[in-house]
Amino acid sequence: MKSSKKLSCILIIDDDPASNFFHQNIIEELDSKVNIQICQDAEHALEYLVKKSMFSEFRPMPAPDLILLDIYMPGMSGWDFIEEYNKIRSQLQKEATIAMISSSSDPKDLLMAEENTFVQKYIPKAVDGIHLKSWINENYVQQ
């Protein structure tokens, strides 16, 4: 059953520019009106989220409905991001759904994602993006 949640902004957090480009194209195919923000590391993503809330009255910075989060990045990992995100949630205008998106085939990563209360979905990176497409279609109404 399709959800009635609207998807107006997605924040992609991934250190790989090719993956970001690929995921951006997949999302735009599904919904050309969705605002896509990209951060190539978790530190900048946290800064974006906090500043978005701090300056929302002065500057239109869209708050994400969905965060697509890579697990393995230099510096702060996706798991570290989730820990820090939990600390700043009260400062945010709205909470985003977090989906881990990774090429990791380590079963521990899948298990950690399933056990983490902040991660709604673990989406394997695929050459055709089929997992991401179907999950977005199942969970969000396109505008």
Regions found by a protein language model. Name each.
Residues 1-11, 17-32, 60-63, 124-143:
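Non-catalytic signal-transmission and effector/linker regions of two-component phosphorelay proteins
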Residues 79-92:
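Short amphipathic alpha-helix used as the core "switch/output" element in two-component signaling
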Residues 25, 80, 94-99, 104-121, ...:
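Alpha4 helix (beta4-alpha4-beta5 surface) of REC/receiver domains from two-component response regulators
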